[in-house]
Amino acid sequence: MRTKAIAAAAILLIWSVLASVTAAGPSQTHHKPSRDEATKAIRASAYEMMKAFLTSDVETFKRHSAKRTLELVSLVFEAARQDPRYQQELQNARITNADQFLGYFLQGMATQYLQAIPLSPEAAARRVANDSAVSFITDSEAKVIAGDSEVARARLVARVWKIDMTDSLKKAVLKEVNDPELRARIKSL
């Protein structure tokens, strides 16, 4: 089932991105936030996104995701829906839209993760988040780094930091998508 392979690869990459950022309180001030305040806000957003992943909370996950990441999820759903190899699986799971598609695979991957690590979603999100770094590119964009690798970008959109995992996910997704038009749309994100 290549749909599961696509989703599993995407979700594993999502998890690695989200698992690398710590929790902190968001900054909602009107002045230009300091880098420390921005770092705290980025980590807060990523923590909430990780917790949403572990609890299969699609709405919260989406709220903290960058638009590009959500567009990628929609394109992956479209690719799976159009591919005859995946249509039965989507039908059996009663998946009719990108949100259900995202929720279905978040739930499966979160269940596996939480079975392997016997912690609450909150504790797991905090635990795996302690080894990340935030490196600013500009005042409105930063790299989220785990170990020696960039795993995501954080982008400031309307004074809220959104986590953009698109570039980290595209390579794995493109390996599984065969439709030339969808491949081109994914590459253009």
Language-model features, listed with the residues they occupy:
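Bacterial N-terminal signal peptides
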Residues: 9-19
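Low-complexity, serine/threonine/proline-enriched polar segments
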Residues: 87-121
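Short, low-complexity N-terminal intrinsically disordered segments enriched in polar/charged residues
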Residues: 20-59, 63, 67-75, 79, ...
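Bacterial N-terminal signal peptides that target proteins for export
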Residues: 1-10
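Residue-level detector of alpha-helical secondary structure
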Residues: 62, 74-77, 81, 90, ...
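Low-complexity, intrinsically disordered terminal/linker segments enriched in charged
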Residues: 126-189
